[in-house]
Amino acid sequence: MRKNCENCGKEFNAKRATAKYCSTNCRVKASAPKPKVVDEHKAKVYDREKNLQKFIKMGLPQVNWITTGIPDFDALTMIPRGRITQIQGAFGVGKTTLCLNMIAGLRDKKVFYIDSEASLNPELLVDLELEPENFHLYNASAYFEDIAEAIKSAAQSGQYEMIIFDSLAACTTRAETEGAVTDRNIGQKAFFMHKLIHMVQMDLKNNDTALVIVNQERETIGGYHPDIYTPGGKAVPYAASLMIRLKTTKSRRFPAAKQGAKKHMYEGHYVEAEIIKSKVNQPWRK
């Protein structure tokens, strides 16, 4: 019986009356899903700008940015307003210097700075040409309970462009200082930090205020390769929209002795910045 293949149209000798294809290859091709043909004239074009404005009207604010004062750092990322940013790194890497450069970039805007480490140098502020009228400093207490109230009041006031908490690892709780050295107060700082974030998160959003939390990197004891962790629990990593890790890559020194200077005098160091979490741009970039 001669029949025509339903796939290729070739005439073939059918052994059965129900045969439709001339070969197994034609049967497989005919059973494969066919691509959907889209009419270019009828295809709907996604209007990005129009839909963006609709989402903003729903109550989702567009991200506004604050410069870090360092062009190379701004090319990686800036600091988002109305959100929480954590800057972490080892000692001496330049976390505080980065925060002070952010303040210098704001110029006439007000900043609330919490110096829980009590290590801020006024000469450095003058070198960066910061205005005392716009720089509100809090270093009256290192207790987390007092610092939390100060952050809460600053966030609710809405008069600050940025609140800088330098640093979370350096603050303590009253239970830690009033007890004995051998007392173990586990999880108190993490509990207070979790509660603080819940209290200020919506105020930061509504007032478009950036909260920058500086944190230290520490190592766990034990094992061949110690794990890196940041004090204060997991509340900040979960709530932060941006997390930046700073790492020293190379120290820069004078190659030769200058007139009246010591040989190989320290000049600075190279810092590598890495985005380890981001809800506002692409993460895991350096």
Where are these regions (language model features)?
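Catalytic P-loop NTPase motifs of RecA-like helicase/translocase cores
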Residues: 120, 171-172, 220
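BZIP DNA-binding basic region
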Residues: 1-35
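C-terminal regions of RecA-like/P-loop NTPase motor modules
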Residues: 34-60, 64-66, 71, 122, ...
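Flexible glycine-/small-residue-rich
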Residues: 89, 115, 167-169, 248, ...
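Residue-level preference for the first positions of well-ordered beta-strands
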Residues: 84-86, 110, 161-164, 210
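The Walker A/P-loop phosphate-binding site
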Residues: 41-136, 152-156
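Phosphate-binding/switch region of NTP-binding enzymes
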Residues: 186-286
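Phosphate-binding/switch loop-helix module in NTP-utilizing enzymes
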Residues: 140-209
